[in-house]
């Protein structure tokens, strides 16, 4: 089973490439961002139940970008976001994998869970330093990078990938495709594991999003490049030439 890591900025055709591989090859598709979206969706649902006036209804699939523009502004202040992020960290800690430096306490009455003072203060400072308009996309960036990677465990999302990948070693799939490589340490892991690295590039798609996860990754010797400068059929043909 060949391990493939895809990289590309928004509107480069990276997601289209991933979908084509998943539909036309015997492959597993893995999103590094899936646990981020899952945790935010579940945390939002819980906060909506507590305070529907602030955390208005957002369907689970909206966090996947299905039927919703994830850059739509949300009417949240920084305290709202801190509360939401605390809920996501508790969910990740219990449902996925413990996060280094994140300690969770429970109240004696009612079993209410909350972050210990040290991780809470780190979270509060990080969110208070963000002055962007909040949206689902910005919440994803905040949780994935500004909070988990920068504050607690740089390799957390990579560890979750590795656990999933190990489950498929020895399977009869031909490809295991990581579809959303956005950070240097993720790509360094890919190369260390002997993965095939494919960059999908398209002229005229420079990102206006200044967050580090939307900056794009450098192309290094040995990487493959798909230049998406034509029709869908031409893109599919280029994918076929690489994988067949």
Curated annotation (Swiss-Prot):
ATP binds at residues 11, 13, 15-16. Its EC number is 2.7.4.-. Keywords: ATP-binding, DNA replication, Kinase, Nucleotide-binding, Transferase, Viral DNA replication. InterPro entries: DNMK, DNMP_kinase_N, P-loop_NTPase. Pfam families: DNMK. Allows the synthesis of deoxyribonucleoside triphosphates necessary for the rapid viral DNA replication. Phosphorylates dGMP, dTMP and 5-hydroxymethyl-dCMP (hmdCMP) while excluding dCMP and dAMP. The phosphorylation of 5-hydroxymethyl-dCMP represents the first step in the replacement of cytosine by hydroxymethylcytosine in new viral DNA genomes. This is Deoxynucleotide monophosphate kinase. It comes from Escherichia phage RB69. The gene is 1.
């Amino acid at each position: 089973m060949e391990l493939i890591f895809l990289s590309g900025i928004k509107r480069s055709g990276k997601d289209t490439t991933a979908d084509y591989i998943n539909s036309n090859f015997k492959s597993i598709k893995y999103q590094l961002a899936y646990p981020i979206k899952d945790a935010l969706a579940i945390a939002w649902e819980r906060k909506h139940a507590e305070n529907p006036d602030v955390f208005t209804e957002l369907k689970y699939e909206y966090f996947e970008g299905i039927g919703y523009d994830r850059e739509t502004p949300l009417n949240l202040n920084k305290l709202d976001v801190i509360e939401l992020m605390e809920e996501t960290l508790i969910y990740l800690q219990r449902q996925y994998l413990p996060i280094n430096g994140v300690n969770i306490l429970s109240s004696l009455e009612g079993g209410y869970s909350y972050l210990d003072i040290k991780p809470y203060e780190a979270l509060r400072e990080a969110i208070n330093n963000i002055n962007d308009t909040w949206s689902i996309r910005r919440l994803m960036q905040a949780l994935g990078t500004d909070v988990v990677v920068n504050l607690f465990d740089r390799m957390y999302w990579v560890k979750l990938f590795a656990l999933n990948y190990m489950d498929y070693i020895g399977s009869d799939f031909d490809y295991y495709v990581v579809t959303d490589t956005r950070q240097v340490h993720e790509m360094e892991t890919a190369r260390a594991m002997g993965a095939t690295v494919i960059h999908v590039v398209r002229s005229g798609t420079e990102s206006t999003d200044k967050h580090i996860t939307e900056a794009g990754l450098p192309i290094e010797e040995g990487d493959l490049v798909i230049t998406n400068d034509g029709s869908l059929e031409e893109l599919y043909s280029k994918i076929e030439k690489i994988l067949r």
